[in-house]
């Protein structure tokens, strides 16, 4: 029996995945977590074989949660299940040790295949993600994203700013003081060589970190 832990900050997504996997022979969802912190706690208690990990979550995001999880429990297999198809997310998560990467648009059959494949010691990457990574490997490296210089927390805050969240809103969601959020904000500006939230939003759109419509 393959024990699975589902990690996503949206209740409907967690519940939907759990229900879909309930009738699959050989799989058992042993728990659900809505943030990285709970994922790490439940993983210690439940000892799952496979963790289905979202990327963008309040508090500890999927990237940092994957790093910490595999540092303490290296035998666990992490499959990233997310809407984040554009680099640097796939590259960063795979470098952090994720065994699989798939989009939330995938069907049940693909998800089951991914779980069984990583449990067997192989990797699984959705076809569209694999094609994107393959194409990138042939591109000149000088076009790497400036966001590659940011930490996981800095990327999390940068994306929230780019999506028009104010300092107080970010402070409330991440349980940080406004002063700490502003410290991160100016550090992000310095690393990206920008001076305003508008420039950050434009840079994020240009490098595929957020949709232009948002």
UniProtKB/Swiss-Prot annotation:
This protein's record includes keyword Phosphoprotein: yes
- Give the GO terms filed under biological process for this record: phosphorelay signal transduction system; positive regulation of single-species biofilm formation on inanimate substrate; regulation of DNA-templated transcription
DNA-binding region(s): which residue ranges?
167-186
Keyword Ubl conjugation in annotation: no
List GO molecular-function terms, semicolon-separated.
Answer: DNA binding
Q: Where is the Response regulatory domain?
A: 3-119
Entries under Pfam families matching the protein:
GerE, Response_reg
Q: What keyword terms does UniProt attach to this protein?
A: Activator, Autoinducer synthesis, DNA-binding, Phosphoprotein, Transcription, Transcription regulation, Two-component regulatory system, Virulence
Domain HTH luxR-type stretches: 143-208
The residues the entry assigns to the signal sequence are none
InterPro entries from the entry?
A: CheY-like_superfamily (IPR011006), Sig_transdc_resp-reg_C-effctor (IPR016032), Sig_transdc_resp-reg_receiver (IPR001789), Tscrpt_reg_LuxR_C (IPR000792), WalR-like (IPR039420)
The 4-aspartylphosphate modification is found at: 54
Functionally, this protein is described as follows: Positively controls the production of the autoinducer N-butyryl-homoserine lactone and the formation of the virulence factors pyocyanine, cyanide, and lipase.
Q: Which PANTHER family match?
A: RESPONSE REGULATOR UVRY, TWO-COMPONENT RESPONSE REGULATOR
- State the name under which the record lists this protein: Response regulator GacA
Specify the species: Pseudomonas aeruginosa (strain ATCC 15692 / DSM 22644 / CIP 104116 / JCM 14847 / LMG 12228 / 1C / PRS 101 / PAO1)
